[in-house]
UniProtKB/Swiss-Prot annotation:
Physiological role: Required for the insertion and/or proper folding and/or complex formation of integral membrane proteins into the membrane. Involved in integration of membrane proteins that insert both dependently and independently of the Sec translocase complex, as well as at least some lipoproteins. Aids folding of multispanning membrane proteins.
InterPro entries per UniProt: Membr_insert_YidC, Membr_insert_YidC_N, YidC/ALB3/OXA1/COX18, YidC/Oxa/ALB_C, YidC_ALB_C, YidC_periplasmic_sf
Gene designation: yidC
Organism lineage: Bacteria, Pseudomonadati, Pseudomonadota, Gammaproteobacteria, Alteromonadales
Entry annotated with the keyword Transport: yes
UniProt topology in membrane: Multi-pass membrane protein
A GO term from the CC aspect: plasma membrane
Signal peptide location: none
Compartment annotation: Cell inner membrane
Record keywords: Cell inner membrane, Cell membrane, Chaperone, Membrane, Protein transport, Transmembrane, Transmembrane helix, Transport
Protein name as it appears in the record: Membrane protein insertase YidC
Membership in a protein family: Belongs to the OXA1/ALB3/YidC family. Type 1 subfamily.
Length: 545
């Protein structure tokens, strides 16, 4: 009877987890299409507030990308980037190592300007002598070429854009690309050839049309902003949050980002500079999140370099950590992150050995089941002892009738005498569920599993089984486990009905789960069946059935 109740407990915990997830996704109001126009500049500033005029979010989403001949194209081994000479904004990014679709050839596009979405990265210089302004407009840069390409054997590629102000001051905006990397160094070089001191500060912001995440109950995902400060290592700031309240946080270092499933864009200013983190939403439905950096005084006859890093690519934890110690937290494993991180590292270790993510999942399943085996054995031993006590428990029930207090006392004395822990069957279940949930988030959040094949028809472990074969096999394995566990004749009829339907309910739920997660549960069931046979054989020799 205890084994049946444990299966019911698994089901209840599982369904509760799914319902909690859906509640988390739905409790906030839906994104609004527009909000009252507000300046991108927070009320408080790092320095010289009146001169800080970061260009506002556009009042309306532009219709389409300008003609390609007007843009500067940069191609590396990882990225295809398009830069608008007006302001030097990054208006397009294609990730060449990541396909849009598993069987297609088109690369995944992150930044773009289309009729459906407006998503760009903007940076500039503001302040008294800045060349970008919400009033005066943006600087129009010149470039020696309209196309740059990282050559074979070349490790870095510099793309310089130049602008000369009406005062004769030369501003050079240099984009530095590195082989194998998704981060781009944006370096402003200012040569003050005038006879007056200049004051400028750099800003960087990400503009994104408000768009609802393609989330579901089985695969919840987040699309929106996030930021980090010295006090808060990682915090999401959704489109709704931006519409409700503008960010205005002063911090040393920090970063800002726009997140979506598997991919991220982020501005990372210098860690030792004092920056302002800000956000806003325009009347046209554009969400902004960005930073405004330190104010620089540039004496006549001197040069000054002001830089920041921009990342546009997959949520690669190693690459993100190298850019900023907390940027890898955009791979959000939820409240069980402390358990998910070692699971992820172990999964990566197994994959590095076998070269197949599906086999790595099988190995991590065997590892988890092996670690829990002593508890599993204790669980089945406890359940067998409980079954053997059923006749004595029935006698107690007949003796004490409806006197629950005396019945409870007598049962506890019996358990103590027979050295039986009535809760002994629950511990492995309670330990297994957090591991299952943590692995669920690892498989859901880790970009390494996107389009990762297993074998045969499973060509992508991050999405559902296209033919539903594994969920059905998983349901069959649950049915076999159920039949192997003796059902007590005194079991409540309602529990019996629920038990009979549990494999069907789980099968239906798992139809839309990522194939990698279903593989974990299926292999876990097969291991559990094998362990049950071994444990039951040993118990029978001891006279326990």
């Amino acid at each position: 009877m205890e084994s049946q109740r444990n299966i019911l407990l698994i089901g209840l915990l599982f369904v509760s987890f799914l319902l909690w997830q859906q509640w988390q996704a739905d409790k906030a109001p839906q994104p609004v299409a527009a909000a009252q126009t507000q300046s991108s500049i927070p009320a408080s500033t790092v320095a010289d507030a009146h001169s800080s005029d970061v260009p506002d979010a556009d009042s309306a989403v532009p219709e389409a990308t300008p003609a390609s001949k007007e843009l500067i194209t940069v191609i590396t081994d990882q990225l295809e980037i398009k830069i608008d000479p007006v302001g030097g904004d990054i208006v397009y990014s294609a990730l060449l190592s990541h396909k849009l679709e598993e069987k297609g050839d088109d690369p995944f596009v992150l930044l773009e300007q289309t009729n459906d979405i407006y998503y760009i990265a903007q940076s500039g210089l503001i302040g008294r002598d800045g060349i970008d302004s919400s009033v005066k407009g943006r600087a129009h840069f010149d470039s020696a070429s309209r196309e740059y390409k990282l050559a074979d054997g070349q490790e870095t590629l510099n793309v310089p854009l130049t602008y000369v102000s009406d005062k004769g001051v030369a501003y050079t905006k240099v984009f530095v690309f590195t082989r194998g990397k998704y981060n781009i160094a944006v370096d402003y070089k200012i040569n003050n050839t005038s006879d007056a001191q200049l004051q400028v500060q750099m800003y960087g912001q990400i503009k994104h049309s408000i768009k609802k995440s393609e989330s579901s109950m089985m695969m919840p995902t987040y699309r929106g902003g996030a930021f980090s400060t010295a006090d808060t290592r990682y915090e999401k700031y959704s489109f709704d949050d931006m519409a409700d309240k503008n960010l205005d946080k002063s911090t040393l270092g920090g970063w800002v980002a726009m997140l979506q499933h598997y991919f991220v864009s982020a501005w990372v200013p210098p860690a030792n500079d004092k920056n302002i983190i800000f956000s806003s939403v325009s009347a046209g439905g554009l969400a902004n999140i960005g930073f405004r950096g330190a104010l620089y005084d540039i004496a006549p006859g001197t040069e000054q370099s002001i830089k920041a890093e921009f990342y546009v690519g997959p949520k690669d934890q190693e690459a993100l950590s190298a850019l900023s110690p907390s940027l890898n937290l955009v791979v959000d494993y939820g409240f069980l992150w402390w358990l998910a991180v070692p699971i992820y590292k172990l999964l990566m270790f197994f994959q590095s050995i076998v070269g197949n993510w599906g086999i790595a999942i099988i190995l991590i399943t065997l590892t988890v089941r092996g670690m829990l085996y002593p508890l599993t054995k204790a669980q089945y031993t406890s359940m067998a002892k409980m079954r053997n006590l059923q006749p004595k428990l029935a006698e107690l029930k007949e003796r004490f009738g409806d006197d629950r207090q005396k019945m409870g006392q007598a049962m506890m004395e019996l358990y103590k005498k027979e050295k039986v822990n009535p809760m002994g069957g629950c511990l492995p279940i309670l330990l297994q569920m957090p591991i299952f949930i943590a692995l669920y988030w690892v498989l859901l959040e880790s970009v390494e599993l996107r389009h990762a094949p297993f074998m045969l028809w499973i060509t992508d472990l991050s999405v559902q089984d296209p033919y539903y074969v594994m969920p059905i096999l998983m349901g069959i394995s649950m049915f076999v486990m159920q039949k192997m566990q003796p059902m007590a004749p005194t079991m409540d009829p309602m529990q019996v009905k629920m038990m009979q339907w549990m494999p069907v309910i789980f099968t239906v739920f798992f139809l839309w789960f990522p194939a990698g997660l279903v593989l974990y549960w299926l292999v876990g069931n097969l291991v559990a069946i094998t362990q049950q046979k071994i444990i039951y054989a040993g118990l029978e020799k001891k006279g326990l059935k």
